[in-house]
């Protein structure tokens, strides 16, 4: 038996490529996420289709993000910064932010602490009010 086969059986093992896992949420046209929440932290695997633009928004939770593949322009506060696979950022709670992609699109892993309550269930939009 291989190590990979043993891990596949573990209920705490997840895969970015397995779209059957996580809580699905459509954030905007061309942008969707799968959410994995623990008690104190939440992961969100966000798929940004090519040439998509997310709503600039804010929330009280701290957010870190890393681009797994593709590229984007990250807006944070009054700044816009080009980002590519391997780049990551930190966003304090309450700071406005958003992403727009090029023809490459992007996959982003977002990390929230504490977990966002509205993301603990299926839904749509960047917040519970959308």
Regions found by a protein language model. Give the residues of each.
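Glycine- and acidic-residue-biased ligand/ion/polar-headgroup-sensing regions
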Residues: 61-72, 77
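A short, N-terminal "cap"/entry segment at the start of jelly-roll beta-barrel domains
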Residues: 1-40, 123-130
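Short acidic-glycine-tyrosine-enriched beta hairpin
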Residues: 78-93
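Histidine-centered catalytic micro-motifs
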Residues: 55-62, 95
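Conserved short histidine dyad/triad with adjacent acidic residue
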Residues: 28, 44-58
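Short strand-coil-strand connectors
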Residues: 39, 75-79, 102
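Ligand-binding loop in jelly-roll beta-barrel domains
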Residues: 93-118
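Structural motif
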Residues: 42, 71-73, 96, 105
């Amino acid at each position: 038996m291989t190590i990979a086969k043993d891990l596949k059986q573990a209920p705490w093992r997840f895969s970015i490529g397995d779209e059957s896992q996580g809580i699905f949420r459509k954030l905007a046209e061309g942008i969707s996420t799968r959410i994995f929440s623990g008690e104190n932290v939440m992961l969100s695997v966000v798929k940004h289709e090519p040439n998509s633009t997310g709503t600039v928004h804010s929330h009280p939770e701290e957010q870190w993000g890393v681009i797994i593949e593709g590229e984007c322009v990250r807006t944070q506060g009054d700044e816009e910064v080009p980002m590519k696979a391997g780049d990551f950022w930190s966003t304090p709670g309450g700071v406005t932010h958003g992403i727009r992609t090029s023809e490459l699109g992007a996959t982003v892993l977002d990390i929230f602490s504490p977990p966002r309550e509205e993301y603990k269930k299926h839904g749509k939009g960047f917040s519970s009010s959308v």
